[in-house]
């Protein structure tokens, strides 16, 4: 039933390369993998296609910012229509501006400029290591599925950290990888994805620590705001 529902959902965008992956957060069970016929022409894009994750990646940026004490959900942050950081000029959609608002509101309204600013204050490698805590960059060997999660660079250069903060530049993720990110937020730790219950998934690069529960709780509240008062 989940597979049928997922396929019907992506087929409403049949003229595009639409994809969906559904993972049960509590167990890691892959419940559905669906994509349109246009996506099928290019292979298993839902599982192995790598794309800039865009604003969905702000979950990672918000988390790393909170982990390193840069922000809290209630922090007052700038959301100008445009911002120049180093050599990079970052724009919000249609250059909308909210002025100074809480991080939660900036997250709910998807302020690129806010998260570029937060990310610019990170050290090289911090965004990458937090992405790994969500499963991005992990290597899974799943019986019955070939998958790629994505890749986030070390970002030694400021411009790479700025662009990475709102899911652009060199950040790449698959729909499968972003399904893991959402499942991690729901479960509090990254579930090990499985397709066949009796077949164990092999995981490489498992040294990423679990995100602390208070930070996950704060992230969930911000994600809820996207639905109740934001862009969802």
Model feature map: region roles:
Residues 18-43, 68-232:
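Beta-lactam-recognizing serine transpeptidase/beta-lactamase-like catalytic domain environment
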Residues 48-57:
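Gly/Ser-rich catalytic serine loop of serine hydrolases
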Residues 63:
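Extracellular glycan-interaction surfaces
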